[in-house]
């Protein structure tokens, strides 16, 4: 416990120093303080859990690291942060971390009282170091789950379930894509001089199913891990499950869909106990960058167009620096604009938007789906951080409650995943890990697509559990 308080003390000191330096007009040192805090918190969590995929560490790395990058203020669009902005960003991680500790501590007490030692055996929180020099999978105690031993009886049902899941996801996503392409009359990749082709490639209610492709590579990694556990080599279906969804994201020229597909697959592999050599990770990173650049070129955004929007203080800054910088930093500046200009809060309507949309209530009560003005530095730059809607709804109280709930959920999910024998718990955990790592990018938990992916993953979780239970009864 003393270590935890020391860690948060360092975090607070770094934040105070960043605030003081920022108020003095020293942008770069202010940013470095927050980047130090992000790295320190992540490494502290890694030492505590021996896991590169620890949720508290990933959120620190993504959210606080993004704040540090934003504090460099390399664009003329950047402005001095308001006191509300500073307090929101500081309090969010503080409350999140404390509530996650509380959930983990109470869970440990409950396990000790019940004599439940199962949570010491599993793989979500404590996994082998993926940067180790050899690739291997841990063998534990339950069949069919990556990282656990398998019995011959369970092997067949496990592998069949994965095959059905992969075929189902591939069939649904490609059928939906072809339907959209036929209905809309174009495929974004093959358009000419259409910078926002993907933005128009949406058939209401159908596009959710097209983007289910992002889950397929991750499920394929679970399938590959299960095959290795059973002593089997990769098969054609596993390769198709990895490649066809990537091809689909390229056809849609969607950088986001491409990134989430690849990163989720890697996260699932790491959480399943897969170890990679450093050169393998570097090769994967190089391929991702190449594909990302290709998709960016196909989106038909010229360098002149992007530089004109970004308004960098140094016009000679190369585009490969300005584009990723602005896609991170400007999101925090958009939050700052909101704290200055918002006069009436939405009282929960923005955070509840996924429920209103996915339940169909918006068709019964259209007023609930009404649009709210977006407070941004520039109309072309509309991405925001994960905290944007919490403030939009209730201000600083919304930030505090959001942090509390997310921390409690994270602590509970981490403990549950440690002892859960269902491989699809890894898929759910990997999605949370991804959202935390890129928490600077959008309002994940008030985005209907986020809940759609989590919902489908949970259905796979339940279906797998029912299949195993039925098999045991036979």
What positions do the PLM features span?
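N-terminal "leader" segments that precede or initiate the main folded domain
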Residues: 1-136, 238, 242, 261-293, ...
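Hydrophobic alpha-helical segments
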Residues: 379-474
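Hydrophobic, aromatic-rich transmembrane alpha-helices
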Residues: 36-46, 215-229, 401-416, 471
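Small-residue-enriched transmembrane helix-hairpin modules in multi-pass membrane proteins
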Residues: 193-203, 291-407
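Hydrophobic, lipid-facing residues on alpha-helical transmembrane segments of integral membrane proteins
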Residues: 5, 9-17, 170, 216, ...
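Hydrophobic alpha-helical transmembrane segments
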Residues: 3-8, 26-41, 158-160, 229-235, 238-240, 259, 281-282, 400-401, ...
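Membrane-embedded catalytic interface detector for glycan/lipid assembly enzymes
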Residues: 21-31, 102-276, 288-305
